[in-house]
Structures are given as structure tokens and as C-alpha cells.
Amino acid sequence: MFRGCMSNISDSPAELERTGSIRDVGSQAKVYAARLRLQNAIDQADALDAIREIAGNLIGTEEVAVYKVDKKRSELWLYWAFGVDPNKHSVLVVSREPKLKQALKGKAVYRLKLSNENLLCTDDPVNALVPILVDGVPAAVIVLFRLFPHKPGIEPVDREICEVLSNCAGRAVEPYRSR
């Protein structure tokens, strides 16, 4: 009888794994880590480094770029990149990139898992376009390029992390307005 009570109190690790509880905690920890890293960035350079760390360690790509919005010219200019050829991806013209319009409205855009669709007019696979909001307005867009080979696509937890990037990475592009 005592043994039966104990099994109700403490589930086995296998049972927790089966029900998804361990995965949920892992996902929450990733989202928390991303938010904490961005909020504790000490300056603009550290905030940009935080974006790189989050993209590489939590989402699964070492090819990431940040483009600042030039509203007057309807273009996005490469502001910072890691693992991306800056000569190949220096300017994004909004009129030639229909998916960018959604990002410039403040909505992240994701490539479907195992899809050949590309989010930008480039030979390099683009998996996400994540707006960086400053005072609720897109000031820049994070472009997540090729994922690690073991990742089939952007997972639900990755979308949550991208939401954190969208709302907390403003310091990387507007260091004096976003704190």
C-alpha cells in the first residue's frame, strides 16, 4: 500500500519523458536563457554577441545576420553578420523580397520543416526572418540562414526563442532607446 502511494507522488524519469514534462522544462529553460542573456547584455556589442550565442546554442545555426531597416529607401542594410558572406548579402530590397514585408509589419516568418521554399531570393537557405522591435516598431530584421544538419527545421521552442529575440534584442541595433 505504501508503495502505491509513492508511485503517485513521484513519477519515474521514463514516465516524465513519455508525457513530455522533461521536454517542456527543457524548452522553458531555453527560452529563459535567451531572455536572460539579452537582458543582461552590457552594451551593443554584447547584445550582438548574445544574438549569435542564442542562434548557435539554442536555435541551431551559425549563420545569422542582422539587417537595419532603411524606410526611406525601402531597403534593409547588413548591419552585422556571423558565418555569412557580407558581400553576398549586403542589401535586401523590400520590393524584391515579399516575405520581408511580413517581418516589417512585426511578424516573424518561418520556413516550413523539410520545405524547399526559401524566404529570400538567395541560393543560401533562409529559415527565419525575425523582426527586432524597438518601441513596438521593427528597427531591424534577424535572418537565420542554414540550420545545423541534425535540425530538420525551426521547432516550436525555436519560435518562442525568436519571439524573445524580437522583443528583447533592440539594444543590439538601438543601444540608447531600447533599455
Please report, for each region that a protein language model flagged, where it lies by residue.
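Amphipathic alpha-helical coiled-coil segments that mediate homodimerization
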Residues: 30-38, 43-62, 66, 96-99, ...
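Acidic/proline- and glycine-rich, intrinsically disordered low-complexity segments
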Residues: 75-77, 86-110
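Signal-transmission linkers at sensory-effector interfaces
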Residues: 1-46, 57, 172-179
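A short, aliphatic-rich beta-strand micro-motif
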Residues: 125-134, 138
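GAF sensory/regulatory domain recognition
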Residues: 53-56, 65-90
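Short loop/turn motifs at secondary-structure junctions and domain boundaries
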Residues: 118-124, 154
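Short beta-strand-to-loop transition segments that serve as allosteric relay/switch motifs
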Residues: 142-152
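Amphipathic alpha-helical "output/dimerization" segments
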Residues: 6, 134, 153-174
